[in-house]
């Protein structure tokens, strides 16, 4: 289904480096590096995860730039030989491990480039998530700008009209938006990133003691540069990816292994139990529409904390 998403985007030539070879650390090295990562997480007060397409491949959704990625094969005139529909896909071990790490207090925020909706399906609360490129399960009102969860993947990408009325009158708060029309909120190449998601992503990346990139080559900007925001303040940066990334030379630690394997080991070392996916916690399986908007109050509250942090770092140290 990521093939259909890619096909729905406008033509664009600069897709970055495609098909770079993957490398794998030995089991012994992976174990040592996971121990090091677990220690870094323990010592950090603010951990931010940056997730890319590589965390969803074990759900049957192809990535884009891997050896068998959508765009890599597209260049050869081919299609991936596996391509689960978005509606069939279920959150991976990584998605569920992220839930556990947040609930146990080890991770404070997640910034995702993925549009597949698997963070949403996993039950991750919106207050912990920035979705920089949109979400195939979200409908956004053109008038009131509120976002709502769709029970199935929306029909379009590129912020096109879904020809449906705003769902605000159907939500639990009973607020109504007259004459609002819903659009998909999946970005095309020329679109600006969603303001609140980007602002929260920038702030969390900057104040992080530890930024961890999971399953991404970090080629798309500005998303791929966010994990570097904390380096000038002495923060740490870890990469878990099978291919080389744009910022390997700046990382404190690089783990070349499947993300599912890494987070399973890290959770075990931290004494964190990874839950199974449950439809009861999946907003796409609920009977009533659920709102998915980032409240402006959340952005303003964290912005005040961010300003204090920046003032302390740049003026008092």
Swiss-Prot record:
Pfam families: SIR2
Miscellaneous notes: Overexpression in flies produces robust lifespan extension in both sexes.
Keywords for this protein: Acyltransferase, Chromatin regulator, Chromosome, Metal-binding, NAD, Nucleus, Transferase, Zinc
Name of the gene this protein is made from: Sirt6
Listed PROSITE patterns: SIRTUIN (PS50305)
Positions bound to Zn(2+): 141, 144, 166, 177
Cofactor: Zn(2+)
GO biological process: chromatin organization; determination of adult lifespan; negative regulation of heterochromatin formation; negative regulation of transcription by RNA polymerase II
Sites where the protein binds NAD(+): 53, 57, 64-65, 71, 113, 133, 215, 241, 243, 259
Native species: Drosophila melanogaster
Cofactor binding note: Binds 1 zinc ion per subunit.
Purpose: NAD-dependent histone deacylase that acts as a regulator of life span.
Family to which the UniProt record says this protein belongs: Belongs to the sirtuin family. Class IV subfamily.
Annotated catalytic residues: 133
Cell compartment(s), UniProt: Nucleus; Chromosome
Protein name: NAD-dependent protein deacetylase Sirt6
Top enzyme category: transferase
Cellular component per GO, a single term: nucleus
Tissue note: Widely expressed.
Domain of life, per lineage: Eukaryota
EC number: 2.3.1.286
Deacetylase sirtuin-type domain: residues covered: 27-273
Catalytic activity, reaction form: N(6)-acetyl-L-lysyl-[protein] + NAD(+) + H2O = 2''-O-acetyl-ADP-D-ribose + nicotinamide + L-lysyl-[protein]
Gene Ontology MF: a single term: histone H3K9 deacetylase activity, NAD-dependent
Disruption phenotype: Causes lethality during development. Induced silencing shortens life span.
């Amino acid at each position: 289904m990521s093939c259909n998403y890619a096909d729905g985007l406008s033509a664009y030539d600069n897709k970055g480096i495609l098909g770079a070879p993957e490398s794998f650390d030995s089991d012994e090295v992976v174990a040592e590096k996971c121990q090091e990562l677990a220690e870094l997480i323990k010592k950090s007060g603010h951990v931010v995860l940056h997730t890319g397409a590589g965390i969803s491949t074990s759900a049957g959704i192809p990535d884009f730039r891997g050896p068998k990625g959508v765009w890599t094969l597209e260049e050869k005139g081919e299609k991936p030989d596996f391509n689960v529909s978005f509606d069939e896909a279920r959150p991976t071990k990584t998605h569920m491990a992220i839930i556990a790490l947040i609930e146990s207090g080890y991770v404070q925020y997640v910034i995702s480039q993925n549009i597949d909706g698997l963070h949403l399906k996993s039950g991750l609360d919106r207050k912990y998530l920035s979705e920089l490129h949109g979400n195939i399960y979200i409908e956004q009102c053109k008038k009131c700008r509120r976002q709502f969860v769709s029970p199935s993947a929306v029909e379009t990408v590129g912020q096109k009209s879904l020809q449906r009325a705003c769902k605000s009158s159907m939500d639990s708060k009973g607020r109504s938006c007259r004459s609002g029309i819903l659009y998909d909120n999946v970005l095309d190449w020329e679109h600006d990133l969603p303001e609140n998601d980007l602002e929260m992503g920038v702030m969390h990346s900057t104040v992080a003691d530890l930024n961890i990139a999971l399953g991404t080559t970090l080629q798309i900007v500005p998303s791929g540069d966010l994990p570097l925001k904390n380096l000038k303040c002495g923060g740490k940066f870890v990469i878990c990816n099978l291919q080389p990334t744009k910022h390997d030379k700046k990382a404190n630690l690089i783990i070349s292994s499947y993300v599912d394997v890494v987070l399973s080991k890290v959770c075990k070392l931290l004494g964190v139990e990874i839950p199974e996916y449950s439809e009861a916690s999946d907003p796409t399986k609920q009977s009533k529409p659920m709102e998915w908007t980032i409240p402006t109050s959340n952005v303003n509250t964290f912005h005040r904390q961010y300003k204090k942090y920046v003032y302390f770092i740049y003026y008092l140290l």
